[in-house]
Each structure stands twice: as C-alpha cells, then as structure tokens.
Amino acid sequence: MQENNRYRLKPHEIVVLKKMRETEARNVLVIGDLHEPFCLDGYLEWCLEQYETFNCTQTIFIGDIIDNHYSSYHETSADGMGGADELELAIRKISKWYNAFDEIGTKVIIGNHDRIIMRKAQTSAIPSKWIKSYKEVLG
C-alpha cells in the first residue's frame, strides 16, 4: 500500500523530510529590531527564555541592531543623545547580546537603521573607502 502523499512530494523529498524529522530540533530564534541603545528593558532576558523554552539551535537577528537616531533623515530630538554617546552606549549594550548568543550559527542581517551611516556617506559623496566595517566599529 502506497503512503498518502498529500503534499505531492517526490519520493526522495519524502526521505529527506523524514530524516530531518528524526534528527534533533532545528528551531531558530528570530530577534528583530533591537534599536540599541534604546532596546526595551528585559527583552534580552525574554529572548534567552524563548531560546531555552523552544530548544533553539540557531539565532538570527533581522536588522536594526543599532538605532542611530542622531543620524536619521527624519527630524531628531534636540534633547536626544549625540552620535558618539549613542554609539558608545549601543556598543556596550550590544556586547551583552553578543555574549548571550555567541554560538556557531548566529546570523545578523543589517537593517535600514544599521545602514544609515553608509547611506549618509553616499548622500555626501564620501567614498566607501573612508567608511569602517561594522566589525571594526562594534569590535
């Protein structure tokens, strides 16, 4: 008797799917929009709890790690932090996330807030050779 194949999978695809289901969990924790240094208090702890609760094996940050409020194309708050202060505080806070999720397989996607410095440089016709990499800035 042939197995019900309601997904219309090819025989080799069924074998691959069954093998995947037999192996250990491959749950991915997706973390979005930290906007450091303005991240919600307790978000790191909540994310760590979800990682454990759902037996995650990988973490993906989906952008906007840094807020870069001071450099927005939109109006910024006159009472807000300056660029150096915001960046230094963001680096300190991001290091906590790095230490919490520093495992093989962690991925970081760069978001529009993360890219704003390069966008501003392009707007000002500054060659990319003058711009540091994220790794150089964040350590």
Where are these regions (language model features)?
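Acidic, histidine-bearing metal-coordination/catalytic regions of metal-dependent phosphoesterases
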Residues: 1-31
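Core catalytic region of metal-dependent phosphoesterases/phosphodiesterases
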Residues: 31-139
